Amino acid sequence: MHKFCRIAVAVALSIASISVLAQEKEVDKDLPVLAPESQHATSTKRITAQFTRAHYKKIKIDDSLSEQIFDRYIKQLDYARNVFLASDVESFAQYRDDFDTVIARGKLDIAYQIYNLNLQRRLERYEYAISLLENEQPFNFELDESYDFDREDAQRPTSVAELNELWRKKVKYDALNLTLAGKEWGKIQEVLGKRYRYAIKRLKQSESEDVFQIVMNSFARVVEPHTSYLSPRNAERFQMEMNLSLEGIGAVLRAEEDYTVIQSVVSGGPADKSKELKPKDRIVGVSQDDKDFVDVIG
């Protein structure tokens, strides 16, 4: 993915409006402290048994598998390596050989502890991002700086100061995109503030089932890259969203961090005919007809 992605035009998508007041009330709430639910231990053991007995690949539950699941889990929680500190991940390393126990016996406490810290770290990052928008003067785009958009293989930050610098550049990058779209600083503050507050709102709406799905999906992807686990609730939602995607703009969408990404374009559909969208494009705004674009990041 290039550092500067194009604004993808998504036609005929309906946008649900969220009031600013509701967002502010949600931001004031505390982060949830998530823990496994009673059914998760049984579900984990059944899913593991199904994979080990019925999957076409022979799976051995051992430390090697455990380490792969652990690495995948951390990657899913912090894909861009801009949330966890290096010391956080180092402290998790003591559990790297325990994830076979997590999936085989349904002992999920370790995974939930890591997830709860991830929620806290993300909250800190978005609060810092919002604080950068309080400046009366916009960012100086004349400085010779670069923002590394793809940090999948980057070194993890070793201090809060390094994290802050990463996020300063991220916010500046977001502001630059809006500046190039013709927005003034006041409007940029409004748009990005709303985006980051909505991200905080989503953090505070996290549920135990969200953690469970990520753990099980980490296991499934290690078994086979094209294998996924979806909880019943999310499977239903996924099917609905897939149907809407295919019937609406003619594209298959997926979530990646704060973005909706085009996974594939359906031949002959509206997106294909428009020649405006292609796989890996990020949708940052949508509109209908000649109306203004609505920001959909976050």
Task: Locate each region found by the language model.
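Bacterial N-terminal signal peptides that target proteins for export
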Residues: 1-8
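N-terminal signal peptide c-region/cleavage motif recognized by signal peptidases
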Residues: 17-19
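Envelope-exposed proteins and targeting segments
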Residues: 52, 65, 245-251, 258-261, ...
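Short beta-strand segments of a lipoyl-like beta-sandwich/carrier module
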Residues: 259-264, 271
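PDZ/PDZ-like domain micro-motif
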Residues: 267-282
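PDZ domains, with a preference for the canonical peptide-binding region formed by the helix
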Residues: 282-298
